Amino acid sequence: MSDLVAKTAIDRRLADIVTPVIEGMGFELVRLRLMSGKTRTLQIMADRPDGGIVVDECADISTAVSAVLDVEDPIEDNYTLEVSSPGIDRPLTRLKDFDAWAGYEARIETAELIDGRRRFKGELAGTEGDEVLITIEDGKEGFVTIGLKFDWLSDAKLILTDELIAEMLRQKKASGNFDESQFDEIQETEGEEADEAETPITRH
């Protein structure tokens, strides 16, 4: 089954390289994107299996991933590595995410039109087989729960609500690493300007 963790061929190749490193440290890869631009940016989102990753842990992942990428050398051009938490309104990239966040609001987009639409907004209702269940507003029946095959999805993300913020703060506190000043910060490793403590990732 496909997922939304890594979409393109190069993203999937990079994910194959960094996933064992991230999982070996006790974390999970949530999403990976190699973004184009004057200087390419490799964006990695990671989290604890039970949520609550903090900035220092993102820094540790950045250092470990940089070392592996330095050896594998999969990116030809100069690039910047960014390792971050998924944030409060996190992307939903794996089928299990829709079970984990059942009861919370989300926006889902599909690659093709489904009954004349591609965008769906509503409350997640878990999964059934390979389908994502979401309760959406229906003009005729009030609310209806529909199933969307996971392979149909092109994007999915939680919607920022008071309930979601409360849950994320609960996870942070439960992890024992709660520091409001560090909430959702990004650890960046700049190619040629990387500190000696971090493996340089500039490529030519």
Swiss-Prot record:
Family label: Belongs to the RimP family.
UniProt cross-references to SUPFAM superfamilies, sorted A to Z: YhbC-like, C-terminal domain, YhbC-like, N-terminal domain
Coiled-coil parts of chain: none
UniProt KW NADP keyword: no
Keywords: Cytoplasm, Ribosome biogenesis
Gene that this sequence comes from: rimP
Pfam families linked to this entry: DUF150_C, RimP_N
Cellular component, GO annotation: cytosol
Name of protein: Ribosome maturation factor RimP
InterPro entries: Ribosome_maturation_RimP, RimP_C, RimP_C_sf, RimP_N, RimP_N_sf
